[in-house]
UniProtKB/Swiss-Prot annotation:
Family to which this protein belongs: Belongs to the ABC transporter superfamily. Ribose importer (TC 3.A.1.2.1) family.
Residues given in the record as ATP binding sites: 37-44
Protein's organism: Rubrobacter xylanophilus (strain DSM 9941 / JCM 11954 / NBRC 16129 / PRD-1)
Keyword annotations from UniProtKB, A to Z: ATP-binding, Cell membrane, Membrane, Nucleotide-binding, Repeat, Sugar transport, Translocase, Transport
Gene assigned in the entry: rbsA3
UniProt protein name: Ribose import ATP-binding protein RbsA 3
Lineage of the organism: Bacteria, Bacillati, Actinomycetota, Rubrobacteria, Rubrobacterales
């Protein structure tokens, strides 16, 4: 079978860095070809070379047997290569139909035929399983719906290759399965899907072949049936990794945090739960179910209408995050770059930021550096200096800086909101080992995740949310993906 895309000896160099190093790759019509590897392996740069966002330093790229010269992303789209980015390239204040045909509007003589545009848009949306009005503004759509619009854009240009960069990063399990159905439909019509992912289980669910990159090079391309999880991880990181989800043998003690009847408008409705010392409590649910909203409400980041919070039997009055921090509650936000870190500050300053009130707002530079060095060693934060700005760190190391900050506050209860999102498999293993160690120390942990294997493997109990309410709490012996999804979607009644 003739490859729809062929790369031969493709390299990309930036000042001081070889991001892609002599890559050979064939992509076949009708296949899902996963590109896997740790952060910094070269996956995203390779996708940018294919979609002509970046110009290769050397090497040759062929599409349908024709050698391609670099002329930019518009040229790549005309050749039938479409890219669906993690951060969608949609105009939020235009309608769905306008986004689908932006720059290619149907009509004559400078006049747009809106009726034809809407009719064609409906057909494209049906093909990706999206039942929305083409006149709706993109800004009113959910993340999952916007992603479908991006895929419909690829169909609108009759793309032969659709590149998807971490497409499930912000999707719940039900939405992931719906996306996979769309992908299977694309490949059944002869289109190739080039798919970047960190998530091991979904690689085995969706891939036909897997190319593994490490340090800018291709280390293997194999049919998925020739791989298992251990072999794939070994190829990705170049070493053995133990259990990715090391369930801690922690002694579960008395109730640390008790929340009763927490409500906030339509977002949270009479939510109650408990977290015990040494326990990892999971929060599961679809996107928008209220998991993050509940954590933010307990932390004082969002106001509540009613409810009670107790820590170690003491009633708390939490009106702002500072109240929660002083009481001993920490929250590691899912948006570490937007809310969790001061990117322009050094690692040392970020680590001591939340604990300054306990030090009356003052800390000497020597003491600050000493604290940061201790946490760097404890958490294996990879950096030549704690004075470096946080923005230059990898996602996994940035996440460790956030953890170090909360350890410095001596928090008794820690909320981890999507702690593994956007970090590679090696960093994930370290992150979950750390969460387990914190539980063994007797802290109460709340783990919020859209990725059910994380919750099922790490948690002692799982609280499932639906439409702002607690739909049920499952004990460990009751865990199953089907049971969690049933509660989250309302197929199963509240328990």
């Amino acid at each position: 079978m003739e490859p729809v895309v062929r790369l031969r000896g493709v390299s990309k160099e930036f000042p001081g860095v070889v991001a892609v190093d002599g890559v050979d790759l064939d992509i076949l019509p009708g296949e899902v070809h996963v590109v896997a590897g740790e952060n910094g392996a070269g996956k995203s740069t390779l996708m940018k070379l294919l979609s002509q966002v970046e110009r290769p330093t050397s090497g040759e790229i062929y599409i349908s047997g024709e050698r391609v010269e670099f002329h930019g992303p518009g040229h790549a789209r005309r050749l039938g290569v479409a890219m669906v980015y993690q951060e969608f390239a949609l105009a939020p204040h235009l309608s769905v139909a306008e986004n689908l045909f932006l720059g290619r509007e149907p009509g004559r003589g400078g006049f747009v035929n809106r009726r034809a545009e809407k009719e064609e848009a409906r057909g494209l949306l049906r093909r990706v399983g999206l039942e929305v009005d083409p006149d709706r503004l993109v800004s009113s759509l959910t993340v999952a719906e916007q992603q479908r619009v991006e895929i419909a854009k690829a169909l609108a240009i009759d793309a032969r290759v659709v590149i998807m960069d971490e497409p499930t990063a912000t999707l719940a399990e039900k939405e992931i399965e719906e996306l996979f159905e769309v992908i299977r439909d694309l490949t059944s019509h002869g289109r190739a899907v080039l798919y970047i992912s960190h998530r091991l289980d979904e690689i085995f669910r969706i891939a036909d072949r897997v190319t593994v990159m490490r340090d800018g090079k291709v280390v293997a391309t194999l049919p998925v049936e020739e791989l298992d999880e251990a072999k794939l991880v070994r190829l990705m990181v170049g070493r053995e990794i133990g259990n990715l989800y090391p369930k801690p043998e922690a002694e579960i003690g008395e109730v640390l945090l008790r929340v009763r009847g927490l409500s906030r408008g339509e977002r949270l409705k009479d939510c109650s739960f408990e977290v015990r010392a040494g326990e990892i409590l999971g929060f599961a649910g679809l996107v928008g179910a209220g998991r993050t909203e509940l954590a933010r409400a307990v932390f004082g980041a969002d106001p509540v209408d009613s409810g009670e919070i107790e820590l170690e039997g003491r009633p708390l009055r939490i009106r702002k995050p500072q109240d929660a921090i002083e009481a001993g509650i920490g929250y590691l936000t899912e948006d570490r770059k937007g809310e969790g870190l001061a990117l322009q500050l050094g690692i040392d300053q970020n680590i001591t930021l939340a604990s300054l009130p306990a030090r009356l707002g003052f800390i000497g530079l020597g003491r600050e550096r000493s604290i940061a060095e201790r946490r760097r060693e404890q958490l294996n934060i990879r950096t030549p200096s704690v004075r470096r700005k946080v923005q230059v760190l990898s996602g996994g190391n940035q996440q460790k800086v956030v953890v170090a900050r909360w350890l410095e506050t001596r928090a008794r209860v820690l909320f981890f909101d999507e702690p593994a999102r956007g970090i590679d498999v090696g960093a994930k293993a370290e992150m979950f080992a750390l969460i387990g160690e914190l539980a063994r120390e007797g802290r109460g942990i709340v783990l919020i995740s859209s990725y059910l294997p994380e919750l099922i493997n790490m948690c002692d109990r799982i609280l499932v949310m639906r439409d702002g309410r607690v739909a049920g709490v499952l004990e460990r012996e009751e865990f199953s993906e089907e049971g969690i999804i049933a509660l989250a979607t309302g197929v199963k009644e509240t328990v």
